[in-house]
A protein has these predicted regions:
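Structural signature of eukaryotic scaffold interfaces centered on beta-propeller domains
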Residues: 2-19, 68-86, 128-138, 185-191
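Conserved small-residue
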Residues: 11-13, 45, 49, 203-208
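Beta-propeller domains
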Residues: 16-19, 26-69, 80-85, 92-119, ...
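His-enriched metal-coordination microenvironments in redox/metal-binding proteins
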Residues: 66-70, 94, 133, 180-183, ...
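Structural signal for beta-propeller blades
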Residues: 98-100, 151-152, 158, 202
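Asp-box/WD-like beta-propeller blade repeats and closely related beta-sheet repeat scaffolds
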Residues: 105-185
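Conserved small/polar residues in nucleotide/adenosyl-binding loops
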Residues: 210-212
Length: 212
């Protein structure tokens, strides 16, 4: 059953879909001593293409030391039935810089371009959060887990963005007994969200491998 929205209505439908022809992955320089910006690499995975298995584009971030981490789409399978939604943007958090990089993958999928940056200082000021980690969509909006508050202390929280990537504010009412932030996923039909724990930003920033 076809639909105009993003994603697929079920795992079975996703299995039937055509193979991807492009892959996006991040490349970072954290811990290498190399003072260059992290970048988003576009990889050609179409076996019929002359550039098959090659990195065909690199989108460098404007700054140095972001440590790009998990990334996510602006829209996902939860809006599969909404024809007004589409996967146009990737959100790339910098876990060290606290910046959120919004990347346009729709204009030219083979050469993504930077659409917007949400500065980490703005996030600290408006939402008291740092250490962005996991990106998931909530219908037309986006939620991002953070490992710490503006001072880098646990437990962090969740930042909500609108569809135009403006800061709405904190998504959660309370972190309750949660001691640390990390990854998460939600099941709207069951009215639950499951999160896991890792560490506060101050635990690993700064960090030297000689201390491990």
């Amino acid at each position: 059953m076809e639909c105009c929205g993003p994603g697929y209505s079920s795992t079975q439908e996703a299995i039937k879909a055509p193979n991807e022809k492009l892959l996006y992955t991040i490349a970072i320089y954290t811990g290498t001593g190399i003072q260059k910006p992290d970048y988003l690499a576009t990889v050609d995975v179409d076996p019929e293409s002359p550039t098959y298995s090659q990195v065909i584009h690199r989108l460098e971030m404007p700054g140095i030391g972001d440590e790009l981490h998990h990334m996510g789409w602006n829209a996902c399978s939860s809006c599969h039935d909404d024809s007004s939604m589409s996967r146009k943007f990737l959100i790339l958090p910098g876990v060290r810089s606290n910046n959120l990089h919004i990347v346009d993958t729709a204009t030219d999928p083979r050469a993504p371009r930077l659409h917007k940056i949400i500065d980490g200082a703005e996030i600290k000021g408006k939402a008291d959060l740092s250490g962005p980690h996991t990106v998931h969509c909530l219908g037309s909006e986006i939620i991002i887990s953070f490992l710490g508050n503006a001072k880098g202390e646990a437990p962090g929280g969740y930042l909500q963005l609108d569809k135009d990537f403006n800061i709405v504010g904190r998504w959660e009412n309370s972190m309750g007994d949660i001691k640390f932030g990390y990854d998460f996923w939600y099941q709207p039909r069951h009215n639950i969200m499951v999160s896991s724990e890792w560490a506060a930003p101050n635990t690993f920033m700064p960090l030297s491998l000689i201390h491990i």
